[in-house]
Every structure is written in C-alpha cells, then in structure tokens.
Amino acid sequence: MIIAVDGMGGDFAPELVVEGCIQAVKEYEGIHIIITGKKELIKNELDKREYNGNKIEILNSEEVISTNEAPVKAIRRKKDSSMVKALELVKEGKAQAVISAGSTGALMAGATFVLGRIKGINRVCLAPLLPGAKAPFMIADAGANVDCKAEYLVQFAMMGKVYFESVLGVKSPTVGLVNIGAEEEKGNELTKAAYKLLKDTDFNFIGNIEPRDIPRGEVNIAVCDGFIGNTVLKTYEGVASNLFSMLKKEIMASTRGKIGGALLKPVFKDFKKKFDYTEYGGSPFLGAKGICIKAHGSSDAKAFKNAIRQAKICYDKKIIEEIENNLGNLIENNI
C-alpha cells in the first residue's frame, strides 16, 4: 500500500511528519510512503535519522497552503502545493490514501474537488473519533457541511456505521441524532425529517440524544449537521483542555494537594491518556473517492504514525467499497 503524506502540513512540519513516517514504516508491514513538500527541507530531516530508503520517497512541491487562505481558491490555484500533490497521487491511483495536518478547509475542498465523491454520496463528511466515558464515539459531521438536508444525515450515519463495523470491529454500532431533547417531536425541521428517515433504516438508531450524553459514551455515532457538530467538538476539546489545567492548578495550590497529586500520578497519567488525540490518529473524510485522513494541526510523530496505521486499516478493510455497498442498500430501500 502506498500512502501520500503532506510533508508541509501542521504546526511541526516537516520535522515531526518525517519522524512519524519513519516510525510507521518500521512498525507496519506492507506500506510505502511518499512525502510531498519542499524536497530540501524533507531530505534534511530524513538525513538526520536512520530509515529504510526503499520505503520512503519524496515528491517535490514548492508551494504550501496556509490555514488563513480561502480553502477552495487555495486548492484550485496552488497546484504545486504539498497538499494538492498528495491528493493528486490518490486521484491518479499512484497512492491509496492521503494524510495531512494542514488546513482542514483546504483538505475538505481537496477531498471534494480533487478526489471527488463516491457516486451517490451527497456530501463528504468529517468524522473525528473522540474518547468517551464508556468507549470512543464519532461525530458525523464535525464541520464539513454547515447546511444539510435530512438525506445527508442518513448518509453520514451510514458511513459512520461502516467505519465502526469495518475499521473498529464494532458490530451494530449505536446511532443517535444530536438534538435539544430526547423526544421525537423535538428540534427543527432538519432533525424532525432526519429522525423519520433514520427510524426507517436498519441502523441501530436509538433516537435523539442531547450533547451532554455524547461524552458519556451513550452512543457510538452522533449524527448532526456540521455547524452543530463543530460546536460540540470545539466545546468538548475546550472543556477537556481546561479540566486538566484547572486540576493541575488546584493540586499545586497546597502541600496537601501536591502530596495527593503525587500519590495519584499513575491514575492521572492513565486518565490523560484516554483524552490523548494522538492515540486516534486523525479524522477521516468519509464519502470521498479515496481514503483521506485529517491529522490534528498540532500532531506529533506519534499522531502521524497512528494516522498512517488508521489509513492502512481503512485500506485493508476496503472502507470505500463497504460504503458503496451500504449506499446501495439505502437506495434499494428508497432512503
């Protein structure tokens, strides 16, 4: 399997991108990586480390898409950017997956306009996996589509279901519709229409769920439009980040707190690990005609290595074909 990695995307590129790629080819069998970006910078990082030159190569590109550029314009105008070059490798069949920690908006535009959508899929969906109290959960969509139709939400649920079953090995994952109340009649026109459609599928649909229920692990796949999903995601990230900061501040405020903190250090370490985004790799763009993984902007080498592992599993489990098959089932049932 060949994986295209945007070598210039992310806060710590290309150094930690390169390190993550080297770790990945050492740990995972059957992968070859093409790093796109400024050849001199990437080669300089490679030369600092021991690596298998038969498993990693560089594709030179002189441009970089920054996070403050208009996404669609950047994808269309910067044809020699590291992100576009990586996407084109997948489009041309020269790679089977693309990974980038660059601009989310630009990668979304690239997944749509360079890779294209799977035939029959209305919108590509950003679907991050996050740690919950009971088990990891997915938000679909987490920001790719702020305006949606009910049919889109059903497709998001289907693609999330495929991911859980194929990639994570979870049989019959639960699907919940994010809403302001649990009752069927709650919500706006979109959620009411989506509820009716989801109820008619063979998904393990548990009905409406409130945002507070999501991190409890009450549902595997939280379905919503991208506006709601991104709000839930950013709130979750903010609360998690501030929780650790507040806890640390309280522990360091007194001698008693410091002693207690020292005794509970292993517990805190395990607890923090559960909230470590690097464990999950990245967020897949589901519905694109190619495996596309968005790594976190602040990804370290471990996060890139795990994103590569994630892409490999998606490829091995034939996630694109599984989405196509499940889409056919929806169409047969007029949903």
Curated annotation (Swiss-Prot):
SUPFAM superfamilies hit by this protein: Isocitrate/Isopropylmalate dehydrogenase-like (SSF53659)
Catalytic activity entry: a fatty acyl-[ACP] + phosphate = an acyl phosphate + holo-[ACP]
Keywords: Cytoplasm, Lipid biosynthesis, Lipid metabolism, Phospholipid biosynthesis, Phospholipid metabolism, Transferase
Domain of life: Bacteria
Family indicated by similarity: Belongs to the PlsX family.
Role of this protein: Catalyzes the reversible formation of acyl-phosphate (acyl-PO(4)) from acyl-[acyl-carrier-protein] (acyl-ACP). This enzyme utilizes acyl-ACP as fatty acyl donor, but not acyl-CoA.
Protein name (database record): Phosphate acyltransferase
Native source organism of the sequence: Clostridium botulinum (strain Langeland / NCTC 10281 / Type F)
Gene designation per UniProt: plsX
